[in-house]
């Protein structure tokens, strides 16, 4: 009996030892598995952006969504860092100058056209065509993509997320008074010749007031050149050309210079103030929220009246070539190796094709770059709600969207000292027109009629002076 008990105890003891070893081994296996998962460091993508306000909040929400869904499954984590455009440009320009190998670049950053061109010269950025499929790229608006093709090829180094497309913003209260009396049509706003005809009639009807102002004369110059062809800045065959076609420049001159000296176009740095004071009926410029516009304006009797707003498409030369302006910096992906580059473009495509990107772009009155988004039912429903709760914003955005989807949009690609080139070209036209207008006022004080004074400065010699100035500027770059 004792022997039996002893054997039984030995077997029981051995069983417990085996059981403990088994449990311990199982724990080790589980722990090893956990450690294995934890040891996989996620790919971190730093994204330097410039978004503010509501758009910044929505962007943060989109990034969080990605990190907890698609990014998590791909083991990718996006870190959004806010910086001003000036901070980004200064950092990049300093880095380009130093050419130090120790410089750290973000994986993705908002970037100016000029900085992007320089980054590409240093082989620091990678193009979208290498990492996104043809089918994926096909969905992006052509004009948005072409602006980022800074090497004179079909390779996109500045990737678009969203952009604005300028329209014509009209003081509907003043416009209604004018068109009732003069039997003019809203459709006349859609062409340069139509606006010129409106401006001439309005000048007489209003006793010498300007019809329009430009929020950006630069946008007018480059858009008009693209409408007429050839554009002032043209890419292709691995080069960037500055075209100084005399006929194209003549068209720009005839509308702007003649418009200013005749009193049809108001030169101003503050279109909002000009609207509020009743100095203009409309301006050509970027869409804005309704909070941007005045609630009252000074009417023809010098009294405060309610400011009502309507909008029209940005003017074109004719219906056969509808080219409209676009504006807004894109992003560049800096080279950090194939895996990170691919992850960066995967995130960008996810962002642009996510249905919530519509709320993000509309927050800043922009058009999202990925066209299929606008075919989604959720987008249709969003715009229906917008038309109910903010009809005027809906109308302005609808005009912008129409320009992008039904026409073509254009903004020149960048190059070294691109910003300086644009500034010089723009101010050359503004300055010569401003000086001529001062001469007109001087002649009027001397007793000449307005028509006589205009005729004295509206000469072929003036155009030749400007044309030679443009040639000199172009030859510098």
Please place each PLM-identified region on the residue numbering.
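Conserved C-terminal helix/tail region of periplasmic/extracytoplasmic solute-binding proteins
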Residues: 398-477
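Short, low-complexity disordered leader/linker segments with a strong preference
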Residues: 1-45, 461, 465-477
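Extracytoplasmic/periplasmic substrate-recognition and gating elements
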Residues: 300-372
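Extracytoplasmic/periplasmic solute-binding protein
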Residues: 151-161, 166-168, 176, 193-241
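Glycine-centered hinge/linker elements that transmit conformational signals in sensory
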Residues: 196-202, 235-269, 309-310, 314
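Short, solvent-exposed loop/beta-turn-alpha elements that line the ligand-binding surface or hinge
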Residues: 129-140, 185-187, 230-251, 299-303, ...
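Early extracytoplasmic/lumenal segment of secretory-pathway proteins
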Residues: 42-46, 50-116, 273
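Hinge/lid segment of periplasmic solute-binding proteins
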Residues: 109-167, 306-315
């Amino acid at each position: 009996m004792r022997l039996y008990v002893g054997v039984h105890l030995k077997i029981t003891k051995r069983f417990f030892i085996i059981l403990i070893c088994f449990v311990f081994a199982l724990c080790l296996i589980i722990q090893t598995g956990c450690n294995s998962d934890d040891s996989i460091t996620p790919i971190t993508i730093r994204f330097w952006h410039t978004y503010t306000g509501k758009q910044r909040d929505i962007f943060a929400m989109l990034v969080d969504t990605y990190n907890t869904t698609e990014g998590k499954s791909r083991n990718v984590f996006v870190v959004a860092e806010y910086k001003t455009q000036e901070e980004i440009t200064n950092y990049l320009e300093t880095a380009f100058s130093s050419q130090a190998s120790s410089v750290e670049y973000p994986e993705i950053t908002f970037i100016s056209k000029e900085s992007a061109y320089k980054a590409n010269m240093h082989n620091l950025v990678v193009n979208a065509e290498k990492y996104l499929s043809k089918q994926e790229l096909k969905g992006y608006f052509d004009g948005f993509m072409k602006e980022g093709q800074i090497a004179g090829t079909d390779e996109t180094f500045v990737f678009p997320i969203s952009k604005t497309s300028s329209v014509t913003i009209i003081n509907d209260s003043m416009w209604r008074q004018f068109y009732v009396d003069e039997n003019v049509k809203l459709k006349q706003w859609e062409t340069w010749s139509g606006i010129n005809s409106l401006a001439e009639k309005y000048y007489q009807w209003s006793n010498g007031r300007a019809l329009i102002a430009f929020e950006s004369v630069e946008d007018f110059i480059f858009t008009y050149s693209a409408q007429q062809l050839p554009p002032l800045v043209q890419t292709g065959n691995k080069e960037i050309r500055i075209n100084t076609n005399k006929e194209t420049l003549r068209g720009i001159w005839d509308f702007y210079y003649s418009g200013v000296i005749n009193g049809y176009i108001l030169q101003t740095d503050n279109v909002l103030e000009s609207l509020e004071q009743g100095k203009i009926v409309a301006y050509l410029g970027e869409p804005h929220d309704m909070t941007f516009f005045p609630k009252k304006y000074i009417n023809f009797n010098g009294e405060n009246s309610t400011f009502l707003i309507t909008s029209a498409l940005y003017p074109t030369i004719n219906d056969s070539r509808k080219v409209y302006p676009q504006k807004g910096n894109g992003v560049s992906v800096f080279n950090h190796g194939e895996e990170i580059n691919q992850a960066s473009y995967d995130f960008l495509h996810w962002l642009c094709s996510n249905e919530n990107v519509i709320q993000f772009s509309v927050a800043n009155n922009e058009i999202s770059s990925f066209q299929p988004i606008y075919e989604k039912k959720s987008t249709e429903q969003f715009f229906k709600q917008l038309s109910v709760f903010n009809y005027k914003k809906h109308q302005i955005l609808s005009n912008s969207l129409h320009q992008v989807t039904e026409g073509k949009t254009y903004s020149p690609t960048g190059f070294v000292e691109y910003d300086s080139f644009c500034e010089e070209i723009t101010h050359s036209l503004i300055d010569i027109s401003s000086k001529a207008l001062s001469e007109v006022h001087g002649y009027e004080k001397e007793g000449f009629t307005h028509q006589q004074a205009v005729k004295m400065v509206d000469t072929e010699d003036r155009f030749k002076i400007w044309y030679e100035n443009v040639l000199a500027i172009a030859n510098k770059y």
